[in-house]
From Swiss-Prot:
Something else known: Bacitracin is thought to be involved in the inhibition of peptidoglycan synthesis by sequestering undecaprenyl diphosphate, thereby reducing the pool of lipid carrier available.
Name of the molecule in the record: Undecaprenyl-diphosphatase
Native species: Escherichia coli (strain K12)
Entry's EC annotation: 3.6.1.27
Compartmental location: Cell inner membrane
Length: 273
C-alpha cells in the first residue's frame, strides 16, 4: 500500500469514525462496511480503529471541558446549571453509576464480546438498536422528569448504565443505547444525549486503553503518519458532528436515525452475504 493511498484511507476512515461515533447509528457497522470496501482489514486495521477513537474522545473533552472539570470539583466562572431551578447537580457519582454495569460485564466477558465482532451480529444489532430508538420515542414520558443534566437522579444514571450494557453487542451503538435508556427513564432527549457524551469519555478511554494495550504489538513506526491523519481527522469531524447533533435533536426525533440504522443493516447484508 503506497503512502498516499494509506493516508487517503486514514482520512476516509477518520471521517467515518468522527461522524458516527457519537451518533446513535453504530460506528462499528459503518467502519466494518467502509473498511471492507477499502480493503483495509486485519490486525493493523483493528489497531487503527482503536487509535482514531481517541480522536473522537478528545472532541468530547474539548466540547464539554467545563462540565468535565466541574465533575471533579474544578469550576471556571459560574457553575453550570440547567436553566431555571435545579434539583441538584450532576456529580462524579452519576458518571460512576452510569459506568459500573458495562465495566463489570465488559471486564468479565471481554474476550467473548470481541468474538462477536462479525457482520451478522452487527447487522442484527443495527436492527434491534433501531427498534429501541423507536420504542424510546414512543414510550418516553410526555414531560421529562429530568429536563436537564443537573436534574438527573442517581437511579436514572444507573439505569442508563444498565442500558449501556447493550452496547457491548457490536453494532448496537453506545450512544443509541444510553440515549434511549435515558429517555425511557424520563430524561429529556437533549440531556440524555449530553449525559451519553460525558459517559463516553471514561468508558471509551478505558476500553480504548485496554484494546491498545492488547494490540500494541501490531504497531510499527511506519504506521505513525497514517494513524496521525486518522486521529486528527476523527477529532475534527467528531467536533463538528457533536455540535450539529446537539442542535439537530432540538428539532427532530430519533426516528430518522432508526430508519437510517435499518438501511445500514441492509447494506451490511448486501455487502457481506
Amino acid at each position: 500500500m503506497s503512502d498516499m493511498h494509506s493516508l487517503l484511507i486514514a482520512a476516509i476512515l477518520g471521517v467515518v469514525e468522527g461522524l458516527t461515533e457519537f451518533l446513535p447509528v453504530s460506528s462499528t457497522g459503518h467502519m466494518i462496511i467502509v473498511g471492507h470496501l477499502l480493503g483495509f482489514e486485519g490486525d493493523t486495521a483493528k489497531t487503527f480503529e482503536v487509535v482514531i477513537q481517541l480522536g473522537s474522545i478528545l472532541a468530547v473533552v474539548v466540547m464539554f471541558w467545563r462540565r468535565l472539570f466541574g465533575l471533579i470539583g474544578i469550576h471556571f466562572g459560574r457553575p453550570l446549571q440547567h436553566e431555571g431551578e435545579s434539583k441538584g447537580r450532576l456529580t462524579l457519582i452519576h458518571i460512576l453509576l452510569g459506568m459500573i454495569p458495562a465495566v463489570v460485564l465488559g471486564l468479565l466477558f471481554h474476550d467473548t464480546i470481541k468474538s462477536l465482532f462479525n457482520p451478522i451480529n452487527v447487522m442484527y444489532a443495527l436492527v434491534v438498536g433501531g427498534l429501541l430508538l423507536i420504542a424510546a420515542e414512543c414510550l418516553k414520558p410526555k414531560e421529562p422528569r429530568a429536563p436537564g443534566l443537573d436534574d438527573m437522579t442517581y437511579r436514572q444514571a444507573f439505569m442508563i448504565g444498565c442500558f449501556q450494557c447493550l452496547a457491548l453487542w457490536p453494532g448496537f451503538s453506545r450512544s443509541g443505547a444510553t440515549i434511549s435508556g435515558g429517555m425511557l427513564m424520563g430524561v429529556s432527549r437533549y440531556a440524555a444525549s449530553e449525559f451519553s457524551f460525558l459517559l463516553a469519555v471514561p468508558m471509551m478511554m478505558g476500553a480504548t486503553a485496554l484494546d491498545l494495550y492488547k494490540s500494541w504489538g501490531f504497531l510499527t513506526s511506519g504506521d505513525i503518519p497514517m494513524f496521525a491523519v486518522g486521529f486528527i481527522t476523527a477529532f475534527v469531524v467528531a467536533l463538528i458532528a457533536i455540535k450539529t447533533f446537539l442542535q439537530l435533536i432540538k428539532r427532530i426525533s430519533f426516528i430518522p436515525f432508526a430508519i437510517y440504522r435499518f438501511i445500514v443493516a441492509a447494506a451490511v447484508y448486501v455487502v457481506f452475504f
